[in-house]
C-alpha cells in the first residue's frame, strides 16, 4: 500500500487539464474497483474496460456504509436513484435505456452494461457510463452535453451485484473493439488511509473515498 500512496502523492498539485474528468455524481462515494492491476481492479482483464472504475455512494453515521442496515432490495442502497452527471463536455454517441433493473441478488450477464451511454469527449476518447435505471437516461445519441449535466439515475441494470456507477474511458465507441484509457479526475477531494486531500488530480484506486469540491 505504501507504494500506491507514494505514487498518488506525487500527483498532488498536478494542474487540471482539459482531459481531466469530473466525478459523475454529487456527494461522497467509495471506489469499489479502480487501479491498474487485476488484484485491485477486475476491469483490467477486459481490454476495453481497462482502468475502469466502479463507484458506490456511502452514507450512514460513519459515512462508510453502502446501505442502511442489511439491504434486502436495491432501494436500500444509497447509490440507488442518485443522479449520474456528465464527467466532461462532449457528444452522446449511443444510449441504451430499456433494460430492466435487476432485483437484488440477480444479474443480467447477457447485457453486462445494462442501461448505459457513451460520450465522445475528445478525439479517440470516449467515456462509457453503465448500470443506470431503466428509462432514466435523459439524453439521446447526437445530443451535446456539458460537464456536470444530469444524464440519468444510478440503477441496478446489467451485470451488477448492487446499485453503483461504472465508468471507463476507451479509444473507440465500440465496447467490443475499444482499448481502455486511464481516466484522470481533476480537482477532487480524496480520503486515503484516513488522510484528507483536497483539490487533487489523481487516477483512482480501490479503497478511496472521493467527492467533488
Short names for language-model regions:
Residues 1-4:
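Positively charged n-region of N-terminal signal peptides that target proteins for export
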Residues 13-15:
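N-terminal signal peptide c-region/cleavage motif recognized by signal peptidases
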Residues 18-62, 67-71, 75-77:
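Non-catalytic extracellular/periplasmic "stalk"
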Residues 20-34, 40-42, 65, 111, ...:
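Acidic, glycine-rich catalytic/binding loops that coordinate metals and/or anionic ligands
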Residues 29, 82-92:
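Generic structural motif
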Residues 69-71, 77-79, 91-133:
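Zn2+-dependent peptidoglycan hydrolase active-site motif and core
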Residues 90-92, 142-154:
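A structural signal for short beta-strand/turn segments enriched in small hydrophobics and glycine
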Residues 125-148:
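Short histidine-centered loop motifs in beta-beta connectors
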Amino acid at each position: 500500500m505504501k507504494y500506491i500512496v507514494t505514487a498518488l502523492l506525487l500527483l498532488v498539485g498536478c494542474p487540471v487539464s482539459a482531459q481531466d474528468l469530473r466525478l459523475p455524481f454529487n456527494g461522497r462515494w467509495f471506489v469499489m474497483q479502480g487501479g491498474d492491476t487485476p488484484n485491485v481492479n477486475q476491469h483490467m482483464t477486459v481490454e476495453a474496460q481497462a482502468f475502469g472504475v466502479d463507484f458506490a455512494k456511502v452514507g450512514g453515521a460513519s459515512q462508510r456504509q453502502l446501505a442502511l442496515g442489511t439491504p434486502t432490495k436495491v432501494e436500500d442502497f444509497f447509490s440507488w436513484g442518485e443522479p449520474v452527471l456528465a464527467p466532461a463536455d462532449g457528444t452522446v454517441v449511443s444510449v441504451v435505456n430499456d433494460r430492466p433493473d435487476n432485483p437484488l441478488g440477480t444479474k443480467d450477464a447477457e447485457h453486462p452494461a445494462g442501461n448505459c451511454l457513451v460520450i465522445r469527449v475528445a478525439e479517440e476518447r470516449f467515456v462509457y457510463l453503465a448500470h443506470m435505471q431503466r428509462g432514466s437516461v435523459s439524453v439521446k445519441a447526437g445530443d451535446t452535453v456539458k460537464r456536470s449535466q444530469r444524464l440519468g439515475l444510478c440503477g441496478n441494470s446489467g451485470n451488477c451485484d448492487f446499485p453503483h456507477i461504472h465508468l471507463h474511458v476507451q479509444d473507440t465507441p465500440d465496447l467490443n473493439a475499444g482499448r481502455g484509457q486511464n481516466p484522470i479526475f481533476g480537482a477532487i477531494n480524496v480520503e486515503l488511509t484516513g488522510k484528507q486531500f483536497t483539490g487533487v488530480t489523481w487516477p483512482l484506486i480501490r479503497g478511496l473515498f472521493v467527492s467533488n469540491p
